[in-house]
């Protein structure tokens, strides 16, 4: 069976060699914390976008897709940067971090990318075998090179021994087997805008050894429970990735349309025509909720006061609704706990058809939407924050409260659509967990 490859491509401003090493590859730099906006010449005509995520998210996300990653990046007026990484090198606890050498090269043309990747393969393999580049290095008596080779050899012997004692295969053998021959080919880059000559800049990541969740998307014929659950979770994770409530909603006045499009496609058995799994062009649009029977749409200010529009059983209240926070809620006043203003939209329908104000056709329409897209999401600056909105997440305790008192609690993830819209500028205390999904469990998140 042919090796499945995942490729992620974009037409962003790309990275030079120095930027790739200092901003993406090296751990613990200040690139995300500097607060500097992207230079105008790098925005490709787009508006200024806030920086998203935390330092290290890119590396962790790449490693989660699969162990072997070929990275190609092109910045305007710069050469192509090409690097090859096997993330399993960093799983060896006996290996010194300083002994791991990630090969990085620059090339001037597209045609040179895959040939130079072969050289990178040989260099990367040395992190496991310890073999020198050439006979001259093999015969050298430089103590530091000899010591490094010995440390690498010893580290993998120790790691292999531990794995075998646990009944597992040798980690070194798995890496060597994958690096025997690179599975990447020119057609894997055929959809990249830079490869097609449609853009002067961008980045491409080619990943091999796909994790189970991605493999389940490639082979849609898998019908076992695990594969089906993976496909469902994948859809829940990436559908509605961009805030579709950005137009004509009162709750959107604090955030801007990110002007961001995406798509996930699968080419089966090297077919010429891909199958669209999901994408911003064919996903749920909040405009479809214009006639839903219950609506809350407005803004919470920094004092916790809600001002907005209410609809109940299909009837819009004429006056603006103002709701003050409960008496037992005290808003934080310390700078590290303050919550800024944010937008809230909720659209919902009745569970029981006999209670609805909708027609039979409308009720069935919204019921069908709910089966596929219901949930309460969180967006920052127009892009979704995970895991909020997935069926396995109840951050706002909506389902928990209903399970305790179904007669009193109306809201339920299965029959509501909605989102909280925040911005990094107005809510800097709502911070992402490093390397994990969701907000840090601090005072601001609890409010």
Where are these regions (language model features)?
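Short secondary-structure boundary/capping segments
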Residues: 24, 85-88, 220-224, 280-282, ...
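GHKL (Bergerat-fold) ATPase N-terminal catalytic module, capturing the glycine-rich phosphate-binding loop
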Residues: 1-209, 215-217
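Extended, regular secondary-structure scaffolds
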Residues: 205-347, 352
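Charged regulatory segments coupled to nucleotide-binding catalytic modules in large multidomain enzymes
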Residues: 214-216, 229-230, 297-447
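Solvent-exposed loop and beta-edge segments used for protein-protein assembly and interaction
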Residues: 63-65, 197-201, 256-258, 338, ...
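Short alpha-helical segments and helix-capping/turn motifs at coil-helix boundaries
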Residues: 54-57, 187-192, 247, 360-364, ...
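Beta-sheet entry/capping signal
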Residues: 5, 59, 68-70, 202-204, ...
